[in-house]
Amino acid sequence: MTAPRTLYDKIWDDHVVHQSEDGTCLLYIDRHLVHEVTSPQAFEGLRMTGRKVRAPEKTIAVPDHNVPTTEGRDTKIDNEESRIQVEALDKNARDFGINYYPVSDIRQGIVHIVGPEQGWTLPGMTVVCGDSHTATHGAFGALAHGIGTSEVEHVLATQTLIQKKSKNMKVEITGSLRPGVTAKDITLSVIGLTGTAGGTGYVIEYCGQAIRELSMEGRMTVCNMAIEGGARAGLIAPDEKTFAYVMGRPHAPKGAAWEAALAYWKTLFTDEGAQFDKVVTIRGEDIAPVVTWGTSPEDVLPITATVPAPEDFTGGKVEAARRSLEYMGLTPGQKLTDIKIDTVFIGSCTNGRIEDLRAAAEILKGKKVAPGMRAMVVPGSGLVRAQAEEEGLAQIFIDAGFEWRLAGCSMCLAMNPDQLSPGERCASTSNRNFEGRQGRNGRTHLVSPGMAAAAAITGHLTDVRDLMMAPAEPA
């Protein structure tokens, strides 16, 4: 009888092609997602050595990082470097015969939203992409993580990856979340507790009642930020919600193949008695709506708190806090709810799905953004955008004073026209608040979609619970 195994153990074991004496493994890769920034050199490497893509049917390409989110982008991209990268992806996808969703295709969007949406991401798979937030796909019980450009070329050429196994970490969220608290608050709270290095060397399995109660969109948000906690990947065991989400999607199995897949997927859970190397437990009812105050995702506090002082920290974190406060232009003791906001960004692979837009629209319905507020919603894919328009969400955003954009990574990172100006302060539903992440000297506060919508209305960081069920302004 075999020893009890974790979910990570099972997926890993099913994909090991060869193991060396030192523990280094050759791992088979089921899905390879590609975007325009980390792939040009990899494809050029294939050309120089006369190699083909080994499994073009398992390789999916989408331009997302560099693409503008305004009309006319399918014919003209002003930034030369961005244009060259998008054109290179277009040529490489066609030359090598891989699956491709160009900007002119309604299915185009952020690669980590397109993969699940199209049924490319399935439970039990290994999924890689030259992108940090590949862990998103772990919400399906897939082993998914980012890889470097040289590894992108290796996977394109061989459909395998050289890896050493990580350790097992369990993050359990017990009980239920309170009203106004979301998946984004879970994942930020975990990072706030463990720090950005807390998951280093581990693959995290998220579990517990609060995780089970999340939708698939919410689970993707949680796994998306596993990398921000230092982990190699984040996983959630598949269940009936997972199967219902996948069923009927364009590239999901059909007929007898579906039944066979389902039988396998139902074995993908951590066995009773399986050992984890590290365990973190948080009570769901203790999690509040949170916001980041500094320049690291671990700089997290409940919205009801005040800006900390450097003296509140120890060791090297004292100087880091001092630098963060200076960069962010904040004063110790200042209420977080007194921090004025210039810009609101709702979107990204963390919070650009239909559920995220619904949550923001619920807060914004019948209201207007604060005077002088710059606010934009960037759906995670063309299909999310179309659905939001069909549901009337787009009109709510437009009526409130938001810009309604085309799909892309947008203001999550300063690689396209959507950027902050120096000193501009943004409430953002994205995943990183590093210095300059959204534009040179821009200031980022990470929040949930509802919290972002609340800040747009009031003009400052706001507890979304104060606006929930609040009456709309008279017409």
Curated annotation (Swiss-Prot):
InterPro entries: 3-IsopropMal_deHydase_lsu, Acnase/IPM_dHydase_lsu_aba_1/3, Acoase/IPM_deHydtase_lsu_aba, Aconitase_4Fe-4S_BS, Aconitase_4Fe-4S_dom, IPM_dehydratase_rel_enz, IPMI_cat. It is an enzyme of class 4 (lyase). Its EC number is 4.2.1.33. It catalyses: (2R,3S)-3-isopropylmalate = (2S)-2-isopropylmalate. [4Fe-4S] cluster binds at C349, C409, C412. Pathway: Amino-acid biosynthesis; L-leucine biosynthesis; L-leucine from 3-methyl-2-oxobutanoate: step 2/4. PROSITE patterns: ACONITASE_1, ACONITASE_2. Keywords: 4Fe-4S, Amino-acid biosynthesis, Branched-chain amino acid biosynthesis, Iron, Iron-sulfur, Leucine biosynthesis, Lyase, Metal-binding. Its cofactor is [4Fe-4S] cluster. It comes from the Bacteria. One of its GO terms (biological process) is L-leucine biosynthetic process. Binds 1 [4Fe-4S] cluster per subunit. The keyword Iron-sulfur applies. One of its GO terms (molecular function) is 4 iron, 4 sulfur cluster binding. Catalyzes the isomerization between 2-isopropylmalate and 3-isopropylmalate, via the formation of 2-isopropylmaleate. PANTHER family: 3-ISOPROPYLMALATE DEHYDRATASE, HOMOACONITASE, MITOCHONDRIAL-RELATED. Belongs to the aconitase/IPM isomerase family. LeuC type 1 subfamily. Heterodimer of LeuC and LeuD. NCBIfam families: leuC, PRK05478.1, PRK12466.1. This is 3-isopropylmalate dehydratase large subunit. It comes from Cereibacter sphaeroides (strain ATCC 17023 / DSM 158 / JCM 6121 / CCUG 31486 / LMG 2827 / NBRC 12203 / NCIMB 8253 / ATH 2.4.1.) (Rhodobacter sphaeroides). The gene is leuC.
